[in-house]
């Protein structure tokens, strides 16, 4: 287990120690002092900044040390008699540039060399996540990112004794595991420029699973059951169930006409959806049903 949040509540550091969770990341001097105080025998992993300009979700504005800062942090860790065993990075969510992994791995090797100069025996590389959950989520095929990672590791880490690489591909595993099924609970029809325009009120919205629209940059593809291929399409807006007008799922999309009680669905919807749903306005998150296919 690696405690991969670079900035941790002191109570959580103490709890990690009681559970024998020794591996944890850091990216600043303050964190080193906390670890020294609450978990002095931790195995530390230094998180570095990356070039995440090609990613939809950018993390380096919040986490990670520059190479210059990394050198100072390694020296500080040495003076505090703390053990740094490796380097971590995250190229950002939904990475569309495979070369970002190459650059980050190259920079990680520079940090390994800094550690060696200070008597640190580094052997762990955590390449984070950033992998797409399904094919339509990234401009770069998953295989291309894998090749860039493997080539870079072969180039920059082929001489590190007992070298170990780990990753955190959360979206990659979670996305395809869930299909969201949600229901039309209300309907309005307007005439706009001589054409019908439908507004539907659904039993889930941005305070539920569709929070991913606001916080994860997702653009869900909504489909309806029992729709024929040649059904006429109409301009459509879908709202969530709450009293907030911001609770809008789609606006101006083209869908067939739906009825109250009709069911819609979104495939590949397991990542950063239900996990962040809330009870806002008294609406509870939707229930999850598990289906085993044989």
State where each predicted segment sits.
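Active-site-proximal beta-alpha core segment in soluble small-molecule metabolic enzymes
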Residues: 1-124
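Short acidic, glycine/serine/threonine-rich loops at helix termini
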Residues: 13-15, 37-38, 55-60, 98-100, ...
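Acidic/histidine-enriched ion/cofactor-binding microenvironments in catalytic or ligand-binding pockets
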Residues: 38, 110, 119-122, 144-156, ...
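Structural alpha-helical segments in enzyme catalytic/regulatory domains
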Residues: 72-80, 148-160
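Glycine-rich beta-strand-to-loop/alpha-helix junction loops that act as flexible
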Residues: 91-92, 125-135, 169-171
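Short, electropositive alpha-helical surface patch
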Residues: 97-111, 139-150, 180-190
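Charged (often Lys/Glu-rich) extended helix/loop segments that serve as interaction or gating elements
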Residues: 148, 160-294
């Amino acid at each position: 287990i690696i405690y991969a949040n670079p900035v941790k509540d002191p109570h959580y550091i103490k709890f990690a120690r009681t559970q024998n969770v020794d591996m944890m990341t850091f990216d600043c001097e303050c964190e080193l002092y906390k670890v020294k105080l609450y978990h002095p025998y931790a195995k530390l992993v230094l998180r570095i900044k990356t070039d995440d300009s090609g990613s939809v979700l950018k993390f380096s504005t919040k986490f990670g040390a520059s190479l210059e800062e990394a050198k100072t942090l390694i020296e500080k860790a040495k003076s505090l008699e703390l053990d740094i065993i490796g380097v971590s990075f995250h190229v950002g969510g939904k990475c569309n540039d495979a070369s970002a992994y190459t650059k980050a791995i190259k920079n990680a090797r520079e940090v390994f060399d800094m550690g060696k100069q200070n008597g640190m025996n580094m052997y762990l590389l955590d390449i984070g996540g950033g992998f797409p959950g399904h094919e339509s989520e990234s401009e770069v095929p998953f295989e291309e990112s894998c090749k860039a990672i493997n080539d870079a590791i072969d180039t920059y880490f082929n001489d590190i004794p007992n070298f170990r690489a780990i990753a955190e591909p959360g979206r990659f595993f979670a996305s395809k595991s869930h299909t969201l099924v949600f229901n039309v609970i209300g309907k309005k029809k307007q005439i706009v420029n001589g054409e019908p325009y439908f507004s539907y009120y659904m039993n889930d919205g941005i305070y539920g699973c569709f929070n991913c629209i606001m916080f994860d940059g997702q653009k869900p593809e909504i489909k309806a059951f029992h729709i024929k291929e040649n059904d006429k399409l109409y301009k459509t807006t879908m709202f969530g169930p709450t009293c907030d007008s911001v609770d809008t799922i789609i606006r101006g999309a083209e869908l067939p006409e739906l009825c109250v009680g009709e069911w819609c669905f979104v495939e590949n919807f397991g990542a950063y959806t239900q996990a962040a749903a809330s009870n806002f306005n008294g609406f509870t998150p939707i229930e999850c049903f598990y289906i085993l296919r044989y």
